[in-house]
Amino acid sequence: MGGILKNPLALSPEQLAQQDPETLEEFRRQVYENTQKNAKLTSHKRNIPGLDNTKEEGEIIGTSSTFLPKDTLSLKHEQDMLAKMTPEERVQWNQRNLAENEITKKQFQDIHIDEPKTPYQGAVDPHGEYYRVDDDEDEDNSDKKPCQVANDDIDDLSLGEPEFEIKENKQPDFETNDENDEDSPEARHKKFEEMRKKHYDVRAIFNKKSREALKDEDEDEDDSTTKEP
């Protein structure tokens, strides 16, 4: 027989007369079963409260990839159901997760982690207790600041007499260039011009490079002749 979209009333009177009552009854039963299956698939996908989400033996409920669009009546029914529910009823708790958490709490309720307290040191005050002298009975140091007391202790420290006498070198470590001091600005300028001319003398540089290259070639030839048997 036809599917759910088949409308037996659209048949002609002659066709209806040819169909027996058992065939019409079977068609209506199939339509009803298909409607129930579609309702269960939709309720399983949307998880609508108030609908029967039970799964019968041998019946396949929609998977996660199943999606059936809702009609206007289903949406209106769902909105009416949600409007009647209280905020507490709308909340859907994960009972399985709650039960697992309770079991975990019971298993680890006697376990305690003992950790030492983290040492805390506040801001250091230069005039605080960490900078005071241990000997509070010393009246001479009572009026001095802690840094002054520490400097006095260092000054009083003596390393003793040296084993060897070190002669002081009265001569300066470097020699002053008196010539540069005595030169006049004209002489310094003339010297600068000569040095610059020597630096930018291309011919002299080329001749120097040529002599160095010839010298290197001569050394290579001498090395090769000495290595021959």
From Swiss-Prot:
Keywords linked to the UniProt accession: Carbohydrate metabolism, Glycogen metabolism, Phosphoprotein
Pfam families on file: IPP-2
MF (Gene Ontology): enzyme activator activity; protein phosphatase inhibitor activity
Top-level taxon in the UniProt lineage: Eukaryota
Physiological role: Modulator of GLC7 type-1 protein phosphatase.
Record's miscellaneous remark: Present with 3440 molecules/cell in log phase SD medium.
Name of the protein described by the UniProt record: Protein GLC8
Source organism: Saccharomyces cerevisiae (strain ATCC 204508 / S288c)
